[in-house]
Amino acid sequence: FAFGFYPEAERWRAWMVLVTPPLLLLLAMAPDFPGRRKVLVGGFCAYPVLAFALLAGGVLGLAAVPSEKWGGLLLTMVVGIGAFVFSFPIAILLALGRASKLPAIRLIATGFIEFWRGMPLIAILFMSVIMLPLFLPPGVEFPRLTLAMTGITLYSAAYLAEVARGGLQSVGRGQSEAANALGFGFWAMQGYIIMPQALRAVLPGIVNSAISLLKDTTYVMVVGLFDLLNIVTAALSDPAWLGLATEGYVFVGLVF
């Protein structure tokens, strides 16, 4: 259930990927730990890249493991956390674009958000994993996991953008006027004054979006990826697991 088809000899790498997020959270909650917020933010930003390099291998003498062998709780964590981290900066840009005074930028951002929010996630996965490869040039192929994560990332970015836009609207106009009076440029004003207040105001909404995204990762089973739920379903066809369906689904329920 935890690792899917990941090679047993290389599962120490999978263990490192699974235990890193809880360790980061514990460090962030330690009151006496210096720079705990920087560790939390920096750790989760670097986590998807480092996790992918560690799991895929092919670097630093690590044996290469194709993404087709990733599965179970491991795949659920990689897709959920990876898609959230990659979608967050896109969502910030979309929120700023939708609040822009420039009509062209506002129209593009609004169109992007409304398009992806209006598409069911299952349809997005089907188009990105099944249909998109049909239009690629011969010899150009991408792993199904990469295509699925791309679709989920764009889908998540559209919803997070609306959460971030709500935070921007909660910040008083006087904040930006004061920043302009002090000589702050647009990006400095957003980075140091506006965005920290906006994100703090909508932190519960961001957490809800992250939890919802983690649960939505179960949809990858429709494109043949063995996430936690799909690996349990597949294991029940093994004679060794006959009669243990309840235990498997209870475990999935506890995780989610």
PLM region spans:
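Transmembrane alpha-helices and adjacent helix-loop boundaries
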Residues: 1-256
